[in-house]
């Protein structure tokens, strides 16, 4: 049996969710449907038009140290291009080392493109300033800001790029919960150790992540980057160690429901257990209803959130929601070893979601 991993991004979907499938799960016992939870979710994603591939190698990177060692090594081996898309590049030791390495790759003839979110940079306590961007560009690195703030600023509040994507030569990709910052290794004084999850992917799912990057890049820069050089063929033969990966993407100003429907569908499909780790647990109405109904069916629902947070009052808001779920029958754990920023969910020990998506209205 192949492991299923569904990667969930915090942007609006380009596609419409299949609400009828979710409705059937709300009213029918799982046994009467006759499908395991992973098969139900795969069917939902396929009918929603979500890209799914089954010839992937996936390596989970369970710490900042693991992520940056692996990413830097892949960048050193790059031959054609390096694409980076992050919510922010914090101007610290890790970012400085990264841009030094990227500058060296430019000298070797490798194309380097990097993109960061304007709000993510502004809200960062060590932002990239004009002088930093000037130096980076002088080294031959193309770096652009996603959706710079213009008047009226309120129009840009929810139109943000929360992705964390790296694509190397179209053959290796990285995604997950980590931006570029040294606190993923060193922690922060007020909250302690910063724990997060990232992953390295090889296989056809790399093409899906490349397509996401190039779509946003070309829109922001008015360029037309693309072609076969950016989408090398991957080995089509699969074996039992390969992993099925589905990329659930959200694109601002399109459809606000795909991500919440994908989460809700995953929860409704559960037959035995749902395990959730999420740092900002303020679920939408649809996800909250899915959790209530799944608990009422006797499914074991376990949720872990951090007692510390980088955003004030977030733990208080989460506890209010979690108290209601505990009264319903959920098991709740508080993580006290620092800040657990991972965004993961496991269902029936059959599939998991990993990504940048928080369980809140954004």
Where in this protein do the model-derived segments appear?
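Sec-dependent N-terminal signal peptides
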Residues: 4-13
